[in-house]
Amino acid sequence: MILSPSLSLPSCASSCSSSQSQFNFKSKSLSLNRKRSVPHKLRNLKCAPTENTPVTRKLDSQSNMTISLHRDEDEENPPPLLDSETTTRPRRIALFVEPSPFSYVSGYKNRFQNFIKCLREMGDEVMVVTTHEGVPEEFYGAKLIGSRSFPCPWYQKVPLSLALSPRIISEVARFKPDIIHASSPGIMVFGALIIAKLLCVPIVMSYHTHVPVYIPRYTFAWLVKPMWMIIKFLHTAADLTLVPSAAIARDLLAAQAAAANKIRLWNKGVDSDSFNPRFRCHEMRVRLSNGEPEKPLIVHVGRLGVEKSLDFLKSVMDRLPEARIAFVGDGPYRQDLEKMFAGTRAVFTGMLGGEELSQAYASGDVFIMPSESETLGLVVLEAMSSGLPVVAARAGGIPDIIPAEQEGKTGYLYTPGDIEDCMAQLMPLLNDRELRERIGKLAREEMEKYDWKAATKKIRNEQYSAAIWFWRKKRSQFLRPFQWLAKRIFPSPELNL
């Protein structure tokens, strides 16, 4: 595959179809490998792939991004229509998830729990290998295996595990997976990769935590480059990479961490029944507002970590003496935040779940998200599904949830770190009940389009099938020299006739 910095393409009679929607890249010229590079400005193009014309890769996103790639024999894509028998028959899927989606507080907790649930409802056999703490005895019939873990050196509350003990290798081998799916980055993904190679099984990696962005906040900035090298090693070894947002896809491409035709979007999903305006509750509002339910109430839900830029909210609240703020969630930064907000009317509820969490979302006036490092921002989806207007930083995966054409309709975005811009978006909502209700209603309607079952079906049927196709192609290319040699050593009898 060859990419040129400036493309002038002939018109095409037909357009190539893809299950992915468009990204609009605006980045400098990048090299994806020795044979290809990403142009500094890629245009939205539709063309039928031929021998000499480019292939247009599309990734599902509300932001328009198109990767225009010249096709050669080494960079083909799977056929758009796959054998229905292979996509509908039950599959055996081994998931390697670190930290545990059952106990660790993070954005992907709901994603993986719903994913496992939906896979089981589709009739698939699922094995989950994860860190040992908090692993339940049963979860929708999936086979659960805990691997002994240790705390991350610079983030003690994050458990890590290689998951490469003889016991786990034996368990996975007996399970006979059709495909292995590992969360990335981390330590366990290395174990998953080794096991996939040992068992000759395709491996999909899904990228969930943008570690290079977090590193300067927790440890030494010089570790960013080595971290990107590790990510590149992992994802170039994977048969397919799943990302939660277009922004993360752009970052991986910019770092040459994966080939463009092997990056696919894991569609967003939200449980619109659990996160619903009907859960609005006066008692919960009294609790969140510190006994003053008549005051404007701002809600933030999520893990309380230093990388979430939550100190920015102190500057916001200093300008809103009449408003109240509630932090729903827990994390290593909680004590610092409590000291920071000492003497104010801020409320820290700790972890909430189930109906209490649904009530917390639905009982606020505005949801605020200052984080600049979200790979997607599932709490933003949950807030919008609850009918809560959102004000969030225009960074990370958030613009994929509230794209430019939807700003002011389904939510508001502000320039990261810009207090004036944030206040300009926040104040009208706090002062105008009708505006809050209108934005909340439109946000709810938008979120009703996204369903976990549909997102899971797309991964299972389309993306897993694509990974298997890439794996088989790579395997056949690897075996080709040996097949050629075998023909020379053991010539076919028919050829001698």
What residue ranges belong to the model's regions?
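Nucleotide-activated donor-binding/catalytic signature segment of Leloir-type glycosyltransferases, i.e.
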Residues: 335-356
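Short alpha-helical donor nucleotide-sugar binding micro-motif in glycosyltransferases
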Residues: 172, 351-352, 359-364
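Aromatic "clamp/platform" in nucleotide-sugar-dependent glycosyltransferases that forms part
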Residues: 372
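A short, active-site helix/loop in glycosyltransferases that binds the activated sugar's phosphate group
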Residues: 228, 236-265, 270-274, 336
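N-terminal subdomain of nucleotide-sugar transferases
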Residues: 2-148, 452, 474-497
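Short hydrophobic beta-strand element within catalytic cores of glycosyltransferases
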Residues: 389-392
